[in-house]
A protein has these predicted regions:
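Short beta-strand/loop motifs in extracellular/secreted proteins, especially
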Residues: 32-34, 49-53, 102-104
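C-terminal interaction-tip segments
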Residues: 1-14, 18-21, 30, 96-114
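Noncatalytic modules at the cell exterior or secretory-pathway interfaces
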Residues: 32-38, 84-101
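Solvent-exposed serine/threonine-rich low-complexity stretches and specific carbohydrate-binding patches
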Residues: 10, 66-74
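Conserved Ser/Thr-centered positions that define the repeating blades of beta-propeller domains
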Residues: 56-58
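Exposed aromatic-hydrophobic patches
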Residues: 23-26, 77-84
Length: 114
């Protein structure tokens, strides 16, 4: 069964990430399904550089809760987060670990179905 996704947004566009942070939040109360595409061009550093990307949801755009969907990234490539369990606002939190980690060419795009 194919699904037509109605909205596409780019949250991060071909950037280098070396510290933990969050994408900007988006109001999504009218959407019922989300797919986040996380593309990483390269990974550098020592002690196993890791980027954990966690989908978060909020009822008020102030207090944030982890949703069940996350992905752990240790190498270049494509990764996907899917969810149909989120509130009015969403964002992606990314946590970076390792020694001198750099994740280059990072792009995060979300598609939602309304």
């Amino acid at each position: 069964m194919s699904m037509i996704l109605s909205v596409t947004e780019t949250l991060v566009n071909n950037q280098s990430i070396s510290v933990s942070g969050n994408t900007i939040s988006r109001g999504k109360s009218e959407h019922e399904y989300l797919i986040a595409y996380i593309n990483v061009g390269g990974v550098a550093g020592s002690n196993t550089p890791t980027m954990t990307v966690q989908l978060q949801s909020s009822p008020d755009n102030n207090t944030w809760y982890d949703v069940e969907s996350s992905v752990v990234i240790t190498s270049a490539g494509q990764n996907v987060i899917r969810s149909n369990n989120f509130g009015k606002y969403i964002r992606l939190k990314y946590t970076i670990t390792g020694m001198n980690p750099v994740f280059s060419g990072v792009s995060i795009i979300i598609n939602t179905k309304g």
